[in-house]
Amino acid sequence: MKGAKQLRNMIYNILENSDTVSGVTLKNSPNSSTLLLDRTDGKGRMTFHTLFPGLTLAFIFVNAPVWPESDENSNLKPLLINYCVSGRSELLLDDGSYIYLKENDFCVSEQTAQKEYIFPTRQYQGIKIYFDLPLLLQSCGELLKSFSLDLPTLEKSYCGNHKTYINEADSELENIFQKLWRLSERPSAFHLQIYTLELLHRLLNMEIRPPKTCGFYTETQVEIAKRAAQILSDDLRQHIPVRQIAERFSVSETSLKNYFRGVYGQNISTWLREIRMNEAARLLSDTKRPIAEISEQVGYSNQGKFAAVFKKQFGLSPLEYRRSKNLENR
């Protein structure tokens, strides 16, 4: 049995341990705690609301490829419910395989010893709910019983043998998660509590569908996809054939495309086009370089084609986009 002090402080310890990680800062306020990520490769925030002793909900906003984790937190094992609002999140499973949480996916798991959380698309928004079950049952057992919420049964049903359950939320679950998400900017403790209890009731009383059985990738497959992405984006002026990259890693072109789509959620051509356009947008906003030069920098020798692709993504021509950013920065 864990000591009472450890039980009382599990969520506190997670936050305090995270505060020791480079680039992560903990800010406390009367009604919440926020972890802020500020690194050269991006920013993010996780805002934590304690709803009951032993039950904490966090809203996650990330614009970065990685959120580092404290090694100390791997020793703490809260029950977790994750829900992806947008973006993609990489999950390392206990058997060493990887799976990707995408929009409207949810998972129920125990904390795993991940050294960092990976967001392949560099953008992620979601909800994470932490359960310190011994403390929650000790402090709110009668309340949970009055609502017929048997959380040990929930844990056993979804995480038997320490497995991770992942699936797409059905319409009823999605509706509850979205009600919670709409409170992310203007939280109401009462409504957060009510909707979280509603979520637990639904999870306990719905028919549990078989978890996803596809979309699992080995460490090698994930590494091949990530290295391919690095090669493709290192110099956007270059147009490197996918076949050439596949040969470099001794896999078929089809396999490489499948690994890539599994990790990034897009085919290679769509992903690379967005990378090119996002870099062009950055150069238009942050520099005074001529548009023709920027076009070549991101791999378009034909400025007209560049302008058409750019407008399709951003709704403005490159010149209009630059002017709008100049007005914003005045």
Give, region by region, the residue ranges found by the protein language model:
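N-terminal low-complexity or simple alpha-helical regulatory segments
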Residues: 1-76
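Short hydrophobic/aromatic patch on the recognition helix
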Residues: 256, 260, 305-306, 310
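Alpha-helical bundle regulatory/interaction domains
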Residues: 92, 97-220, 225, 242, ...
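Conserved phosphate-binding and hydrolysis motifs of nucleotide-dependent enzymes
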Residues: 265, 299, 311, 315-318
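Terminal helix-turn-helix DNA-binding modules in bacterial transcription factors
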Residues: 226-234, 238-246, 262-304, 323-330
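Glycine- and acidic-residue-biased ligand/ion/polar-headgroup-sensing regions
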Residues: 75-95, 133
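Conserved mid-sequence domains
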Residues: 235, 252-255
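Short hydrophobic beta-strand segments that form the core of ligand-binding sensory/regulatory domains
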Residues: 59-61, 80-82, 125-132
